[in-house]
Amino acid sequence: MGSYSFPKTERLLKRADFLKLSRSGRTKQTRYFIAAMLGSETDTTRLGITVSKRVGNAVERNRIKRIVRDYYRLNRDTISGNRDINIIARKYVASLNNREVRDELGKLFKKIVRSDG
């Protein structure tokens, strides 16, 4: 079993990386999330999380980011290959409880895994 940490090497941190994903990445969508994906030059899969102010106040935005990070941390082994992924929360995701957010992420990650190959 691998480490459950989420180190900086597995995070998208630079604005240029986010812009590259938004311009030329492929997208997968659910009702409450969008995933922008692109092959990575690094040797790991990196995750970025975007939750805009339209989603809610800081407490709600941080809750959504925390759940997304935790879900990725526990399920990153299901994603094969080296890619950059940006998970973008849609406006009404804050109306969901934690279980419903995880279920939506499960649907999104299934779409991401199906796009492997």
From Swiss-Prot:
Protein keywords: Endonuclease, Hydrolase, Nuclease, RNA-binding, tRNA processing
Keyword RNA-binding recorded: yes
Transmembrane segments: none
Family, as annotated: Belongs to the RnpA family.
Catalytic activity: Endonucleolytic cleavage of RNA, removing 5'-extranucleotides from tRNA precursor
Entries under SUPFAM superfamilies matching the protein: Ribosomal protein S5 domain 2-like
Gene Ontology BP, a term: tRNA 5'-leader removal
EC class: hydrolase
Subunit structure: Consists of a catalytic RNA component (M1 or rnpB) and a protein subunit.
EC number(s) stated in the UniProt entry for this protein: 3.1.26.5
Name of the protein described by the UniProt record: Ribonuclease P protein component
MF GO annotations: 3'-tRNA processing endoribonuclease activity; ribonuclease P activity; tRNA binding
Highest taxon of the lineage: Bacteria
One cellular component (GO) term of this entry: ribonuclease P complex
HAMAP family: RNase_P (MF_00227)
Intrachain S-S bonds: none
Gene: rnpA
Gene3D superfamilies in alphabetical order: 3.30.230.10
Function: RNaseP catalyzes the removal of the 5'-leader sequence from pre-tRNA to produce the mature 5'-terminus. It can also cleave other RNA substrates such as 4.5S RNA. The protein component plays an auxiliary but essential role in vivo by binding to the 5'-leader sequence and broadening the substrate specificity of the ribozyme.
